[in-house]
Amino acid sequence: MPSSTPPALFPTLYLASQSPRRQELLQQIGVRFELLLPRPDEDAEALEAELPGEAADAYVRRVTIAKAEAARARLVASGKPASPVLVADTTVTIDGAILGKPANADDALSMLTRLAGREHAVLTAVAVIDADGELLPPALSRSSVRFAPASRDAYARYVESGEPFGKAGAYAIQGRAAEFIERIDGSHSGIMGLPLFETAALLRAARVAF
């Protein structure tokens, strides 16, 4: 007679992200995790290079899967115990262009002035590789954000705060940039970098306890 014992749940997962926001969001829903970050010899930024003519949704999905596969290989090489691996990537798009992390202050100011008074899309893809090494179908969260008109000086002061650096589109919705945001339509957590509804569904499928 087949056993009716349910599969064991994993008490923790591996989070392959340095983002404090993603860590805070996982903690918000009670997920326990261990960081699984790139080694010094890994070129993590190379995974984020755009392909010619690549659409934003295809880009963010491809990058997320590539990061997940790299993280899984890192886990296997480390000899750590098997457990699901979570990866996410966020990008901002407007007029068909992908706005990643600004390279410098001028780049950040250029991005922000481009967003001023307009609506743009924020895409976050989430991928989970289960403890057996299988990639679950990635999830994609798409939200719209409208920036109110603001002066170039206002954006320049925001850039001087340092907050735009390391953020797709050169802003953080949970930070000082909130003063520029007129409205959003979609997932607030997705705009922050980890859509919790989609993430929770993937973690349940991977048998993560939370």
From Swiss-Prot:
Belongs to the Maf family. YhdE subfamily. The record marks 21, 90, 174 as: Important for substrate specificity. CDD domains: Maf. The keyword Hydrolase applies. It catalyses: dTTP + H2O = dTMP + diphosphate + H(+); UTP + H2O = UMP + diphosphate + H(+). The lineage of its organism: Bacteria, Pseudomonadati, Pseudomonadota, Betaproteobacteria, Burkholderiales. Its EC number is 3.6.1.9. Nucleoside triphosphate pyrophosphatase that hydrolyzes dTTP and UTP. May have a dual role in cell division arrest and in preventing the incorporation of modified nucleotides into cellular nucleic acids. This is dTTP/UTP pyrophosphatase. InterPro entries: ITPase-like_fam, Maf-like. GO terms for cellular component: cytoplasm. Keywords: Cytoplasm, Hydrolase, Nucleotide metabolism. One of its GO terms (biological process) is nucleotide metabolic process. It comes from Burkholderia lata (strain ATCC 17760 / DSM 23089 / LMG 22485 / NCIMB 9086 / R18194 / 383). The active site is at 89 (proton acceptor). Its cofactor is a divalent metal cation.
